[in-house]
């Protein structure tokens, strides 16, 4: 009887172990892809304006978002979000938390099979909203297509007030794109695969609960090189001319 049970449960155990390891590998690969996409997009000076990137509290990268196999026009993507550490978001870029993006067929109007998205989270309310639960862009957090190029100073009031600025790249074409109506949420299962334990997304992204995993080093190093300091928190010393 014991031998029979062994023959029944041993294959199931081996299969479950394989599935778990395979999922972990996929999540590691996705983190590495986030780093590749970030490097390709952020290292082009005329794409995302430097002043906006410097003001961003967090950055989210969704690589290769595709049309879902279900639903008319539905799309689904998975990626990673990293935030500047510290109470005022003025520290180093921290360990990423895995995220999921769900919505309509955004970005596919030009016939692309897959679209890369980069989202800038511009304030702490936007960051806390996204990390806390499932957020509908445009309703739970204000969102707008991000301005492109060196002339970002000409951005509209809508863009200036937005908590989330979004950009897309498909077939080599880069542009600001509105993701209003889509949802963003923490991917808790993927976080467990990456970090080996169940830990809230907010603890990872905002409170330094985890170290940067090797698969995320390219993403973090790209951001460190492109925007190492939070511009709005830099202090300057001025000469007050304190003569006698």
Residue ranges and their predicted role:
Residues 1-6:
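Positively charged n-region of N-terminal signal peptides that target proteins for export
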Residues 7-16:
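Bacterial N-terminal signal peptides
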Residues 22-244:
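Small-residue-enriched, tightly packed secondary-structure blocks
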Residues 16-22:
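Bacterial Sec-dependent signal peptides at the C-terminal "C-region" and cleavage site
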């Amino acid at each position: 009887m014991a031998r029979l049970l062994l023959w029944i449960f041993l294959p199931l155990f081996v299969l479950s172990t394989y599935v778990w390891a395979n999922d972990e590998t996929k999540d590691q690969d996705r983190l590495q892809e986030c780093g590749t996409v970030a490097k390709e997009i952020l290292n082009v000076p005329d794409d995302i304006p430097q002043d906006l990137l410097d003001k961003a509290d967090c950055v989210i990268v969704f690589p290769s978002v595709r049309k879902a196999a279900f639903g008319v026009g539905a799309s689904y993507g998975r990626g990673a979000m990293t935030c500047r550490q510290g109470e005022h978001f003025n520290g180093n870029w921290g360990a990423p938390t895995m995220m999921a993006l769900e919505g309509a067929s955004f970005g596919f109007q030009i016939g692309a099979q897959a679209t890369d998205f980069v989202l800038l989270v511009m304030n702490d309310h936007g960051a806390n909203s996204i990390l806390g639960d499932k957020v509908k862009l445009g309703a739970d957090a204000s969102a707008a297509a991000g301005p492109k190029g060196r002339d970002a100073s000409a951005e509209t009031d809508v863009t200036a007030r937005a908590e989330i600025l979004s950009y897309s790249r498909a077939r080599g074409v880069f542009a600001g794109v509105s993701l209003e109506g889509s949802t963003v949420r923490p991917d808790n299962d993927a976080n467990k695969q990456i970090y080996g334990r169940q830990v809230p997304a907010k603890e990872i992204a905002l409170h330094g609960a985890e170290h940067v995993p090797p698969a995320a080093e390219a993403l973090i190093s790209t951001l460190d090189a492109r925007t190492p300091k939070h511009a709005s928190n830099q202090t300057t010393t001025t000469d007050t001319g304190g003569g006698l």
